[in-house]
Amino acid sequence: MELNFLWLILAIFLGTYVVLFGFLRKVNDWYYVSRLGEKKKSLPPGDMGWPLLGNMLSFIRAFQSSDPDAFVYNLVDRYGRTGVYKSHMFWSPSIVVTTPETCRRVLMDNEQFGRGNPESTKELLGKKTLALSNEEHKRLRKLTTNPFRGDKALTMYVGYIEDIVVDLLDEWAGMKKPIVFLFEMRKLAFKVIGHIVFGTTSDHLLELMEQYYTDLLLGLRSPAINIPGFAFYRALKARKLLVKLLQDVLEERKKMVGIEQQKGNRGMIDLLIEAEDENGKKLADENIIDLLIINLLAGHESSAHASMWAALYLYQHPEMLQKAKEEQEQILKRRPSTQKGLTLEEIKQMDYLAKVIDETMRRTSLFIPIFREAKVDTDINGYTVPKGWQVLVWTRGVHMDPEVHPNPKEFDPSRWDNRAKPGSYIPFGGGPWICPGADLTKLEIYIFLHYFLLYYKLELQNPDCPVAYLPVPRPSDNCIGKVIKVKNF
């Protein structure tokens, strides 16, 4: 009798679990999909996950494992290689695009796809600035892009970046204790972008800002929960401190406008202060500060991580390391005896290093997709993308797709011997909102690797350290090691 009663309880429990499980898995479908009416029939394959959380649990589980690409591979295994899937990601109904063709379509089509960001990103980077009209965005983009692009701009920065790299490498080599290589690379990159944005400012101020950016980055893709203990709470506090610092710098710069001594130390901040629209209206301080926050963030993360990973990959592949070194040695041999330091023309001759950098950026793609939003009901590959849904350009899905890049987990610079298929390499996005600092990022990596490969080596404290993928791919110890000088300049 007691045994039958236990079986009854177990059956009720299992039945309740199955019914509840099935009900909860359908809530998002009912809420977001059913309201679309006839359009729901032409939605791409996929599922909407759990209420509120959507598919974030399976996403986080994949990126906390040793196989972060399992998230996209699972979509392909379950629903086929459609290149477009419905989901619920980052707390919104979403369309995930994962092939070169679908990603390129979304990135290039400014008429049907606008900028889209999670609420946390809008709060932390500035709602008003992210919501600017297309025309206003184009005007400001031109203003903030000019300091980063073109041979004239890049030539101006070669010597400055070179000085920072040489000084810091020498400083690291002189340290008795191991350094946290990734953290030091971030400081290096932040010094560079700080010079471009401010023209000149104190090292202490840049160090403070770099510390605040660490918390800001962690909160960008977190749920907008402003409660102590959550990443967004810390990030919001960091933003407030950044805004205060930048407001002080802005006020000081406004006092310096037109002063002769200041003209040699101009940065992006001065261009933004002086900018006017067709009616002579200047930018509000709030917009200027938001633009500074965005450009400082974008200007140091990518170059720091890519520089670290390029060095690690080369040391893991001695034959590639030797080939990269020989290329740099040849550049020195061709250099006139009267020339001091690198030139942009020499950097353009680094063909093999260019492939190393491209392969590094492919192999270590961030987990964060590129966010867009459908402006109108539109069609991709015969599937409906509903107006207002966010569209996630899954760059890592493209970069780690074995049908696009054979043996994608292998580090193989030779895969770039041939021209890449359009849309198959998108570390900086594409279309109207392509990252304006792409050329500067690569310039920093070239200069760092040139000096590092010729004159230094890295001895890792934990050479078999596992890789962590959240919030960015990195050795779980953040690459602790000693930088050792092996040759004098």
Curated annotation (Swiss-Prot):
Q: Which InterPro entries match?
A: Cyt_P450, Cyt_P450_E_grp-I, Cyt_P450_sf
Know the name of this protein? Answer: 7,8-epoxymelianol synthase CYP88A108
Q: State the Gene Ontology terms under molecular function.
A: ent-kaurenoic acid monooxygenase activity; heme binding; iron ion binding
Q: Needs which cofactor? A: heme
Q: What class of enzyme is it?
A: oxidoreductase
**Coiled-coil segments on the chain, per record:** none
Enzyme Commission number, as recorded: 1.14.14.-
This protein's major location comes to membrane
Task: List the keywords (alphabetical).
Answer: Heme, Iron, Membrane, Metal-binding, Oxidoreductase, Transmembrane, Transmembrane helix
Question: Could you give one GO CC term from the UniProt record?
Answer: endoplasmic reticulum
Entry comment describing in which tissues the protein is expressed:
Mainly expressed in petioles.
